Structures are given as C-alpha cells and as structure tokens.
Regions:
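Alpha-helical transmembrane segments of integral membrane proteins
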Residues: 10-230
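Short, small-residue-biased leader/transition segments that mark boundaries at the very start
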Residues: 1-7
Length: 230
C-alpha cells in the first residue's frame, strides 16, 4: 500500500490516522477561529477607546500596546504556554490574549480619521449616545480592514497551535491536533518508513494556512477593488 491509502493506515498504537487527521483539522480551525474572535474583540474595544477619546486614554493604551508588541512574539507565547496548564482552551486563551495589539492599532488608526468626518460630528452635535456613535457609526466603517486583518491572525494562530502542540505545550494527547500528530513522528525510522504519520498533517497545515491567506486576499480585493489592480 502506498501513501494514497492513508485512510487505511494506523499509528504505532493502532489509532486510525485518517480519523485523527479529520479531528485534528477541526481542532486547528477551532483554535484559529476562537483565538481570532478573542483577539479581535479585545483589539476593537481598546482601539475604539484610544482612537475616539484620544488624550490620556490614547497615550496609556498605545504605550501598553507598544510594550506588548515589543516582546518577541513567539517568546511571549512560549512563556505563557509554560505558565499555564497545557490544553485546548489554555492555548485558545493564550493566543487570543497575545494577538490583539495589531487589531487595536488598526482600529485606532481608522477611528482617528473617522471621528473627524461630518457624519460623526453630526451625531455628536445631535446628542446621540456614545454607544450609538461608536458601534453604529464608527465601527461599521472599520469592519472591512478588521476582517482582512483577522484572516492573517487566524492563520498565525493555527501555526502557533501546531508549533506549541508539536513541542508538547499545546493540545495534549489523546486529543488529536496537527501539531501533536507531527510530534509522534520524530524518529528517523518513522520519517523514512512511515510517511503517512507525518506527511498528511504537515500538508494540511500548509493547505489551511495558504487557504486562509487566499481568503484574506479575496476579502481585501472585494472591499477595495481598485487597490487589487496592477
């Protein structure tokens, strides 16, 4: 049997490789989506506050954002993963609370320009509630860049989960993830004689990340057609 029969293959302890691969893909997507939602919500809230109010609030929030971004990203993730108990929900929360600074800076930049527009000033003069101005007037006009940026955050989160699980600091066995499936294929014997243990999860990591980046490119072109033309 060749590699094409991966759906019939088993690992060293008799677990079906194809079933575990399908489950691992679901875990990777779950981590990517939930971590992106958490980081996006945090970044949007902080970016709205910093951009709209300015002054001391802007200075404090942006200095805190700069401080978080000044740490090497992968080192920050590794330290957080080492502190907390490894597991699915731990890695989702860690990635969600580490990936928000980019979203916050993006939203703040958009809010700084939008708050000077006539339709926002008109709402302020009309005495509209702050909640309405932020979430009904300003936020909808920042959705497009947020969605585009969120796709890159999702791809990075999935890569980070795979890396941490490979190192034994992410999703723990017996739960399958693409990273810990690769973790079980480190010996030369497995690499050379049992490629069905490591090649399918490796390929799926590449396919998922590239596909999400393609979605991000398509969203960018859809929201800004003129910007995508050469």
């Amino acid at each position: 049997r060749g590699l094409g029969d991966v759906y019939k293959r088993q690992d060293q302890i008799g677990r079906d490789v194809f079933s575990r691969l399908l489950y691992a893909i679901r875990i990777s997507l779950l981590v990517g989506i939930l971590a992106t939602v958490i980081s996006t919500v945090i970044g949007v809230v902080l970016g709205l506050i910093a951009g709209y109010f300015g002054g001391v609030a802007d200075m404090l929030l942006m200095r805190f954002t700069d401080m978080v971004m000044s740490f090497p990203y992968i080192l920050l993730v590794l330290v957080a993963a080492a502190i907390f108990k490894p597991g699915l929900w731990s890695i989702i929360l860690i990635l969600g609370f580490v990936d928000w600074p980019g979203v916050a800076r993006l939203v703040r930049g958009n809010v700084l320009s939008l708050r000077e527009t006539n339709f926002v000033k008109g709402n302020v003069v009309a005495g509209m509630p702050l909640r309405h101005i932020l979430f009904s007037e300003i936020l909808p006009n920042t959705v497009a860049p947020i969605l585009v940026y969120a796709t890159s955050v999702m791809a990075i989160s999935m890569l980070d989960e795979a890396a941490l699980s490979f190192l034994g600091m992410g999703v723990q066995p017996p739960m399958a993830s693409l990273g810990n499936m690769l973790n079980g294929a480190q010996s030369i014997t497995v690499l050379t004689s049992q490629p069905w243990l490591w090649l399918p999860p490796g390929i799926m990591i590449v396919v998922l990340v590239v596909s999400i980046n393609f979605v991000g490119d398509a969203l960018r072109d859809a929201f800004d057609p003129s910007g995508g033309r050469r």
